[in-house]
Regions:
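Carbohydrate-active catalytic/glycan-binding domains of CAZyme proteins
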Residues: 19-334
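Bacterial N-terminal signal peptides
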Residues: 5-14
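N-terminal secretory signal peptides that target proteins for export/translocation
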Residues: 1-2
């Protein structure tokens, strides 16, 4: 009963309402720092996904842990050989600390212990088990020419992942899964098809195990790192188009309309935020929504990267993100 009361109270705070129904004088949540998080090992945190960990009662962030500070790595070897880092927050998402890396078991045909791990997405099934959809490159390479796969893994504790299975999709060169539960049942995955001019494709599943590819979802502009979520009566897709984030809106999660302009294309003023924003995640928390993204703060072509957060705003038709405004973060446990 106490736990339920706390969740309801947090929901009221997140929507900016007091218990009396009157508008609260201040937006709830602690102010997030800039940067929100830097990886203390390799200083290359990117591609965040934020999920509630009910086992520890804290929010966890999974991220690609690029080897930004490792000397002697030629060409793009530094973005290969990566593991998935984990950070956690005990204040509803405003401050984060490093936890370690995810224990991910991959078979030898997918690179085994030498595989490159990128851009996870994590969802929780109705039975309580967690499912990760991970981009896997079977080795460490100096170029972009090699196969990439989206691999499904499962876990009971969010730390240890096994039962790896490649998801059969349109081509053997795919990255960046975004998976959501559909209102009528089943699941939908969006991903980047690198062989089709880096268009965004999608696939459907009844059980998170067997997937049917449905073809191209959007293809007006090349992009990667799609994130799909439902908020304020619409479906939204945010993609990394390397000039900020492209935004699409849909009534049915099938037919998408592009929003003019890009989010986070103009550099911010905060520390490590004076660069375009890339590869996002979005957490919907009550009536509010928070976009997590990464930057290369030292400029284009540099390696170091940091995680940032901004609160989204919308009238139901257009998404907005004021990255220089103080982000008071309050993520409701889910």
């Amino acid at each position: 009963m106490v736990a339920r009361f706390l969740v309801v109270l947090l929901a009221l705070l997140a929507t900016g309402e007091a218990c009396s129904g009157e508008q609260a004088p201040h937006v709830a949540g602690a102010v997030a720092p800039k940067p929100l998080f830097r990886d203390p090992v390799h200083d290359g945190a990117a591609d965040p996904v934020v999920v509630w960990n009910p086992l520890v009662g804290r929010w966890w962030m999974f991220y690609t842990n690029r080897r930004a500070n490792v000397p002697g790595l030629a060409d793009i070897a530094w973005v290969h050989g990566t593991r998935i880092g984990i950070a956690e927050s005990d204040d509803m998402g405003a401050h984060w600390r490093y936890v370690g890396t995810a224990n991910i078991k991959l078979p030898e045909n997918l690179g085994g212990a030498d595989a490159t791990q990128w851009a996870p997405d994590v969802v929780r099934a109705p039975d309580g088990r967690f499912h990760m959809f991970l981009t896997v490159v079977p080795g460490v390479f100096n170029d972009w020419k090699h196969p990439r796969h989206i691999v499904h893994l499962s876990s009971s504790d969010l730390r240890n992942w096994d039962d790896a299975r490649e998801v059969p999709l349109a081509v053997p060169k795919v990255i960046d899964a975004s998976v959501v539960a559909l209102p009528g049942g089943g699941w939908r995955m969006w991903y980047n098809n690198e062989a089709d001019k880096k268009s965004i494709y999608f696939a459907d599943s009844e059980d998170l195990m067997k997937w049917a590819d449905r073809g191209r979802a959007i293809g007006d502009q090349a992009g990667e790192g799609p994130k799909v979520f439902r908020w304020k009566g619409s479906w939204w897709m945010v993609t990394d188009v390397w000039q900020g984030l492209g935004v699409y809106r849909s009534a049915d999660a099938l037919n998408w309309t592009r929003q003019p302009g890009n989010l986070l294309q103009e550099p911010g003023k905060g520390e490590d935020d004076r660069a375009i924003g890339g590869h996002p995640d979005v957490v919907v928390s009550g009536e509010r929504a928070f976009l997590f993204y990464f930057t290369h703060p030292d400029g284009k072509g540099t390696r170091r990267s940091s995680i940032q957060v901004v609160e989204l705003a919308s009238d139901g038709q257009v998404l907005r993100a004021e990255r220089d405004a103080a982000a008071r973060v309050m993520l409701i446990p889910q």
